Amino acid sequence: RWIFVARYEGNRTGEPVHFNSHIDVVETGHGWTTDPFGGEVRDGRVYGRGTCDMKGGLAASIVAAEAFLDLCPDFAGAVEISGTADEESGGYGGVAYLAEKGWFSPDRVQHVIIPEPLNKDRICLGHRGVWWAEIETHGRIAHGSMPFLGDSAIRHMGAVLEEMERVLYPLLEGKRTAMPVVPEGARSSTLNVNSIHGGEPEPEEGFTGFPSPCVADRCRIVIDRRFLIEE
């Protein structure tokens, strides 16, 4: 996957500004009434996967940079724009890669603007932290007609989820930040189960019927933990 960085140097020494947007998108999902990658314009709006999150932000950055250069050709510092991959799956091959290679070091960039879609008229000076993790339970496979011969990993995962509901979620909801975070729900620590998979894998083309009649010997969840600055 590609990463691009464009930089325009000013005429004098100053503090560079970097606009960063991610160019990857999540899965298209179902229920589209337009081609998700067609970019159809209707009633002044563009419809397509990623138009909001966040190709619109990238386009706005380019337009803003062009307008600034037209109005202030004799500016100090530099203007940078980057488009990075991998944001939707962790950022390790995108922003983290650029950071590791020194692209955001203080001698190169003093200000970073990320035009993520956070509703209108909302400017943020930071963001909650994130930690993604996997939990996997194991059991013993058996035929579905004789589950007593097996040990269901899905039932074990059910116990994990029940404990999260009983103990972990109330604990996290009790953690509150003193910062002016918006929306209100984001003032607490949060945890989401992003996905759960168990049993025999579905065909690559998607679910077409009942899965294999087996006791699941493995079950896996991916959790998404968001941290407050106080944590």
Annotated model-derived regions:
Residues 13, 24-26, 120, 142-144, ...:
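Short, acidic Gly/Pro/Ser/Thr-rich loop/turn segments
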Residues 8, 137, 225-227:
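Hydrophobic beta-strand positions in extracellular immunoglobulin-like domains
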Residues 125, 144-207, 212-218, 228-231:
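Acidic-enriched catalytic cores of C-N bond-cleaving enzymes acting on peptides and small amides
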Residues 46, 51-168, 185-187:
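Fold-level recognition of mixed alpha/beta catalytic cores in primary-metabolism enzymes, strongest
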Residues 22-24, 86, 196:
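Active-site beta-loop-alpha junctions enriched in small/polar residues
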Residues 1-49, 70-76:
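Acidic/His- and Gly-rich active-site-bordering loop/insert found
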Residues 2, 131-133, 219:
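Hydrophobic core residues within well-ordered beta-strands of beta-rich domains
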